[in-house]
Amino acid sequence: MKISIIGGGAWGSTLAQLLTDNNHQILINEINLEYVNKINNGIHPIFNQILKDVKATVSLSETLEFSDFIVLCLPTRVMRLTLRKINKIISQPKYFINVSKGMEIENYKIIYQIVQEEITIQNIKNYACVMGPSHAEDVILRKLTLLVAASLDFSFACKVQKIFYNYNYLRVYSSNDLYGVEICSAFKNVLALISGVLDSFDFGYNFQAGFISRGLLEMAKVVDFFKGDKQTVFGLTGLGDLIVTAFNENSRNYQAGKKIGLGMEIKDIIKNSSQSIEGINNLKAFYNLSLEKKIDLPIVKEAYQMIFNYKSIKIILNNLLKRPLKLEKIF
């Protein structure tokens, strides 16, 4: 099968190798010419591992003509604009598979909703996402990984499941909870960012565990708002992805949070990062969502005040600890 990947960074190039291992033909579209040259010379652009039989081009039209399966692997901030370009180029319907984890700041749309708005319905054969605890640096080394393929059309989720499944190192589960999976995958970026901030202050494991538990509850509230399945929060794309992101030194969001806690300016963190840090924009998105839709997300709200309005950690913790005492109720 031929598969086109839009975005050849850390994750896009890694998935290209996985799909090539699965005997698919891959063409990556990447705007960074240096990345394109490295990929075409058989080298992963970020990790410098060997890539076999993976090709890349700067031409978006060439990539779209290559196959009917389009894998979206882009930062959320450029997703809408890129989809508009795609919609102008394609002349026949495509299958869209999203592997990007994020939410738009302005209108808190997940990637599925952005695709619906920017790609005319006649150009969409079907849509799925593939998410889960999956640091690219492990997958490129073919370390064991578990993911979830989700679609509103369960039969298509199962089709995508088989495309990505590799019996040697990557197992894929299927789901029809598309909204829940994409929300969890975006929200965990926020919790990982906050986890990094907390670690920089060395509050200890007790508080870290409490924060994660209550953070999952807030994740569930957002999933419920989007009419997703709250049980998804405790699966691979919720708790699973949170574990690998919130406590891992290789996590961009966790590292960004640590730097914020140590006093580094956000603009400098973004400037010095070669890869997208989705947690920063996702925090803004979920904060705005909580205000407009009146969703009670105390951790998100206080984290926003600390990170963007420079409130002291002492004030933030006092605000959280002085909330009215109540029954622990999960759902």
From Swiss-Prot:
Its main location: cytoplasm. Keywords: Cytoplasm, Lipid biosynthesis, Lipid metabolism, NAD, NADP, Nucleotide-binding, Oxidoreductase, Phospholipid biosynthesis, Phospholipid metabolism. It is found in: Cytoplasm. NADPH binds at W11, K101, A136, R252, E278. PROSITE patterns: NAD_G3PDH (PS00957). Sn-glycerol 3-phosphate binds at K101, G132, S134, K188, D241, S251, R252, N253. The keyword Cytoplasm applies. It catalyses: sn-glycerol 3-phosphate + NAD(+) = dihydroxyacetone phosphate + NADH + H(+); sn-glycerol 3-phosphate + NADP(+) = dihydroxyacetone phosphate + NADPH + H(+). GO terms for biological process: carbohydrate metabolic process; glycerol-3-phosphate biosynthetic process; glycerol-3-phosphate catabolic process; glycerophospholipid metabolic process; phospholipid biosynthetic process. Its EC number is 1.1.1.94. GO terms for cellular component: cytosol. Disulfide bonds: none annotated. The active site is at K188. Pfam families: NAD_Gly3P_dh_C, NAD_Gly3P_dh_N. Catalyzes the reduction of the glycolytic intermediate dihydroxyacetone phosphate (DHAP) to sn-glycerol 3-phosphate (G3P), the key precursor for phospholipid synthesis. Belongs to the NAD-dependent glycerol-3-phosphate dehydrogenase family. PANTHER family: GLYCEROL-3-PHOSPHATE DEHYDROGENASE (PTHR11728), GLYCEROL-3-PHOSPHATE DEHYDROGENASE [NAD(+)] 2, CHLOROPLASTIC (PTHR11728:SF1). This is Glycerol-3-phosphate dehydrogenase [NAD(P)+]. It comes from Phytoplasma mali (strain AT). The lineage of its organism: Bacteria, Bacillati, Mycoplasmatota, Mollicutes, Acholeplasmatales. The gene is gpsA.
